[in-house]
Amino acid sequence: MDIVGGQNLRQMWDDLAEVYGDKTALIFESCEGIVRQFSYASLNEEINRTANLFHSLGIRKGDRVALHLDNCPEFIFCWFGLAKIGAIMVPINARLLGEESAWILQNSQVSLLVTSAQFYPMYREIRQGNSTPLNHICLIGEQLPADDGVSLFSQLQARQSATLCYTPALSTDDAAEILFTSGTTSRPKGVVITHYNLRFAGYYSAWQIALRDDDVYMTVMPAFHIDCQCTAAMPAFSAGSTFVLLEKYSARAFWGQVRKYQATVTECIPMMIRTLMVQPAAPTDRQHHLREVMFYLNLSAQEKDAFTERFGVRLLTSYGMTETIVGIIGDRPGDKRRWPSIGRVGFSYEAEIRDDQNRPLPAGEIGEICIKGIPGKTIFKEYYMQPEATARALEPEGWLHTGDSGYQDEDGYFYFVDRRCNMIKRGGENVSCVELENIISAHPKIQDIVVVGIKDAIRDEAIKAFIVLNEGETLSEAEFFSFCENNMAKFKVPSFMEIRTDLPRNCSGKIIKKNLK
């Protein structure tokens, strides 16, 4: 089923501007509370001016341009402005440091970067090191540094026409983006995402949450992340909805922002749900218009139930990854939830559980979750310049090996067990980190928890728990280990525990385990 046809992102925005005109497309709120708002017509003009800006700097179809930005309207301008001229966006995680950012610039062969004054000193050092092909920086800010090869985004954009001046032929198979994976266990890989991928994501994710043009979709997810782009922005724009982009997440401000913008849909990661739950209860907790809250792994059933009971919202599970573009397994708005199931496979996809010999497994047996899609259309096209890595993950028939363990029941509902790399091998037993984390998170003194495997000369691996306590709490080792012994099999009880003030996380809220080992 082809729901995109031949429509690329340039055509999408031209059509949206014509159909929705003065309807509000984008609302942005900064950390200081400054609000900027754009209609579909005015946003398309900003996108065109930005496309012309890139053309004036020598960018042509197929060229790669990096963005290192926090959430801001300019990210949206650049994303679609580059797509309109057939150039390729390379978004960089705003939390990355110099060496990691330079590595991405080098591996994607980027010569032009758009960034803000906050990150400029880091890139000045990178350019001085001559380790990358970066030769020009377009700066979002008020003051132009006295350095060669730097220009102000606002000045350049203001000089441009609102009519597109460069319109090369585009195909939906053309790359629109190279999105580097989070790299929690190794160097990130560049996931190539096409015009078709993004257009499909818009239609698919809008279907997943039954999105309409009178909806308001609010997100605090970082714009450089697949969730913001393909689960929030693309469906909101594709449906003619209003997209509300907040610069940063604040647990104290979140519900006020939901009410302020009358948001009907939002998305949360587990960290957000947990921090919202520790805010003081208020009479206004249920005074909002939210009908769906999309969330991503992992939450325990107790956490889900407590959240929905307190705030009166429906949680909608969505399971996916950068390579799948969207949440290919999940709940549907009209379905009864079957927790702890992560839902059923969505349209245009197939899913199987396979063993170590790549053979399908029957219901109830744990194996690897494998997804079948169409490369470059419903799943990613390839890893940039890494054919061997592409071949390992993606079979010729379109089967993608997720690296996740799970099983399905007789009714086709899928259950996530753990990342295969998160399975701890302890004395011949496979122990799921997620299972232990869900059990330990039920302790009333514990706010956050992560479990890792560490080398053990006798039993392959020992289990260590890193813990963040609720404010004002103390927890002894004896109390912790007693709780574990009473709630899990003996071979699953951690050997070590360490209390920390926080845990290292990437932009999507995933804990960076390599920083803990």
UniProtKB/Swiss-Prot annotation:
Pfam families: AMP-binding, AMP-binding_C. Its EC number is 6.2.1.48. It is an enzyme of class 6 (ligase). One of its GO terms (molecular function) is crotonobetaine-CoA ligase activity. Signal peptide: none annotated. Pathway: Amine and polyamine metabolism; carnitine metabolism. GO terms for biological process: carnitine metabolic process; fatty acid metabolic process. Keywords: Ligase. InterPro entries: AMP-bd_C (IPR025110), AMP-bd_C_sf (IPR045851), AMP-binding_CS (IPR020845), AMP-dep_synth/lig_dom (IPR000873), ANL_N_sf (IPR042099), CaiC (IPR023456). It catalyses: 4-(trimethylamino)butanoate + ATP + CoA = 4-(trimethylamino)butanoyl-CoA + AMP + diphosphate; crotonobetaine + ATP + CoA = crotonobetainyl-CoA + AMP + diphosphate; (R)-carnitine + ATP + CoA = (R)-carnitinyl-CoA + AMP + diphosphate. Belongs to the ATP-dependent AMP-binding enzyme family. Catalyzes the transfer of CoA to carnitine, generating the initial carnitinyl-CoA needed for the CaiB reaction cycle. Also has activity toward crotonobetaine and gamma-butyrobetaine. This is Crotonobetaine/carnitine--CoA ligase.
